[in-house]
Structures are given as structure tokens and as C-alpha cells.
Amino acid sequence: MEKFQGYLEFDGARQQSFLYPLFFREYIYVLAYDHGLNRLNRNRSIFLENADADYDKKYSSLIVKRLILRMYEQNRLSIPTTDLHKNPFLGHTNPLYYQMISVLFAVIVEIPFSLRLGSSFEGKQLKKSYNLQSIHSIFPFLEDKFSHSNYVLDVLIPYPIHLEILVQTLRYRVKDASSLHFFRLCXYEYCNWKNFDIKKKLILNPRFFLFLYNSHVCEYESIFFFLRKRSSHLRSTAYEVLFERILFYAKIQHFLKVFVNNFPAILGLLKDPFLHYVRYHGKSILATKDTPLLMNKWKFYFVNLWQFYFSVWFQSQKIHINQLSKDNLEFLGYLSSLRLNPLVVRSQMLENSFLIDNIRIKLDNKIPISSIIGSLTKDKFCNLLGHPISKANWTESSDSDILNRFVRICRNISHYYSGSSKKKHLYRIKYILRLCCVKTLARKHKSTVRAFLKRLGSGLLEEFLTGEDQVLSLIFPRSYYASKRLYRVRVWYLDILYLNDLVNHD
């Protein structure tokens, strides 16, 4: 992100003027619509079909020049709200303009925020690794920490239903009044559109709304992490680099003034040295080793924090307390729980021997096979019973294209669920995809499955195994790989950067 700092060309007078590059820097639009920056499309399907939005294909430099000219010639901020539908710039006839402006506004604001966030890493004993961006990097942390926890608080992070709450939250980070007014105008115009098809197309590019959501959640986490550090017996420095702290301490001072009388009681209420927090996919989990009473106190705290400080209505039913030893926690497409492994250790001292019973607690991650079968059924890879069927809409493609599609899907699923403690369900998913591939090819060539396999041999199905086997053979010793014990080992691939459709089955 540092190499894009020069595109903004901020000086002392325009350091907070985000509208300046929006109106006068034509190449910032090229930066915003560079597919290299948008390669991690969060809406991209694991099935890799129709990944690009329609409006991205309509982008051209001529439209950018026309848009900048219209913004420069007229003062659009003076248009009354009642006349928005008559506005030729932000009107119903030009939804593409809003798409371009919303994406660009998010990019312009993201760059200085990212630079400040990167500066917070300086002097910290935390290495900047791209592996930390992987979703799977969370699971080793959970395996290490959750084995000492017994209760988990599953929280659905609320989102404000009123746009003005987001604008007020953004004011803590953006001090440019004109940019906030322009942002409010664009957002209200989007909300006033009655054409649902236009809204659906514009929301396919989530950069703008993702930025608003992260800004909103960041303010909530700033308060939570502050209480977490002050209430904990252990002064961990890892929390200092988890979120952006622009104008953070000023907000904390205001928070202390509001709760100045009850603040010591709050810290005593929530004191817990074994508290672990993880946020993922619009949810957050809070794990602790304490009693259910403490979890109910945290539940009460979250409800009051959202309602009274952030003006967001939040129901306590959206917070679930799970006991890891009894309940399964739905986490990033896995069903996680604690498994007790009894161990018997024999100790011998001189002529006396002792048997010591020991229990080892281990985080057990299982594959939700019923949900995945439902997703495969929805995309017509199998029926409701899990029996593979052919993909009729893929028969128009070439044989190599069909095979590559199935291999890519199978590899993605295998990499994501390689951390499962039981591979039986993973093998069933692979079997469904392999047989679905064979049935699709047989249908294309108007043949039966048996005749098609007899004609091509078993080498066709080896494409599903070669890539993964080569990777694992480089990681583990040959003797370990040949003993079949590898299939009982959990392997976390650190290249999973987005949630796929099979994981996001909700």
C-alpha cells in the first residue's frame, strides 16, 4: 500500500481533503479499478463462475472524464434531498456513476488508514507475515488457547440500520467535512433508489460497504480491547496491533468520563486472565475458562455497549453461550468442540510402579457434512441423498476445461478442510466431485460411465490426487507419508484468503 501513496499527492493543505483526488486526479480511478487490487473478491465463488460484476466491465476512461467534468462544473452538494431524483449526475439514469464514486471514495480513504495502521507495527515484536492474512491462521491460535477454555460466547455483531450512525462513526476518523457531506449524499441516494436490480448490481462490489463495516466494528473493538487490557492480569501487547487507533485515546477519555463512577466496578466485574477474542465473518467469539456467571456478565456488557454507546438495537438472543465440552461451535465452516483424550502413564521408581491417569484436552474440528451436501445439491453436483449427478450446463465446455473446473473445486475444498480431525467426510465430498466429473464427461460424449472409464482408464481420476499429494510429500518425510498416518494428521494451508460458498452455507 505504501507504493500507492504518491497517487494521492497530499500536501500540508490537502492532507485531509479526500475530495481533491476524487475531482482532480484522473488516474486514481485507474488505481481503484485495477483488477490487481481487486483480485481478492470476497463474493467470488469456489465454483469460479461469473465472478466479475457487470459494472466493472463497463469501466472506461471516457466515462471517468465525463464524470469528473460533471462534478467539477456544478456544485452538487447544494441539491435538496427532494430533488435527488432529478439530478442527472446521481440520478436513476446513471447508477454507474455512483458505483465508480463509492469504490473510489473507499480506496482514497483506505490508503491513509492503511499507512497509519502499518506505522503502528513499528517497534512491535510481531512479524508482518502474509500468512497472518489467511483464515486458517486462526485455527492454530484456537488449538493453543481453546484447550484451556470451557465456555464460548458466540456474538453476532450488529450492524446499524440507520445511515447517520455510520456517518457519525466515520467522523472520528475523517475530519474533512466536505468529504463526509459528499459521502452522506451518495449513501442517501443509494438508499432512495427503488430499482432493486440496480442495487443488486452495485452491491456486487463490496469495497465501499466493507470499509464502512470495518470502520464501525473498529470503534466497537477499540472500547472492548481497552477494557480487555485493563481488566486482565496479563499485559499482552498483541492487542495493540490488531486494529487501527486513529483518535482512539480521545474516544477512550470520553468513555471514561461517561462511566467515571462505575468504571472500577466494570473492571472488577469483567476481570479474567484467560479471555480470548476472535472476530470472523460478521461474528465474534469470546472464550474463557471461568464459570457461566462471568459469561452472562459479558453478555450483559455487550448488549449495553451496543445500545447505549453506539445507538444500535441489540437483542440478547443474538449472543449464545456454548460449553465446548458438550456443544459444537460453528466456526468458519467447521464444527469445533473440545475432545477429552484419556492417557495412562506408567511410572516406575525402583521396585514400585505407578499408573497415572492423565487427560489431554484437544480442539476437535469436524466437517459439517450435511451442510456441505446441501450446498453441493444447491449447485447441482448431487441430489439430496448425496448421490452424484452430471452438470448439464458444463457439457458445452471442452474436456480439459471441465476437468480443470472439477479439479480446482476439489483442491479448494480439500485444502480448506484438511484441518479436520476426521477425513472420512472429506473423502465422501471428493468422491461426489470425482463421480460428478465422470458423469458430466460421459454425458457430453453420449456414453455410459462404465464405458467412458473403460475407454480412458483410471488415469482420469489421478488428476484429483496429483497436486495435493506432491505438496504433502514435500512437507512430511517419505516414511511418514508411506505409513498412511498422514491421513490422520491435520494440515492447515495458509493460502485461504476468503470464505467460499461451501463454508458460507448460512
From Swiss-Prot:
tRNA processing among keywords: yes
Keyword tRNA-binding in record: no
Main location (coarse class): plastid
Any one GO biological process: RNA splicing
Subcellular location, record wording: Plastid, Chloroplast
GO annotation, cellular component aspect: chloroplast
Molecular function in Gene Ontology: RNA binding
Domain of life where this protein originates: Eukaryota
Keywords: Chloroplast, mRNA processing, Plastid, RNA-binding, tRNA processing
Protein family according to the UniProt entry: Belongs to the intron maturase 2 family. MatK subfamily.
Role: Usually encoded in the trnK tRNA gene intron. Probably assists in splicing its own and other chloroplast group II introns.
Name by which UniProt lists this protein: Maturase K
Taxonomic classification: Eukaryota, Viridiplantae, Streptophyta, Embryophyta, Tracheophyta
Encoding gene (name): matK
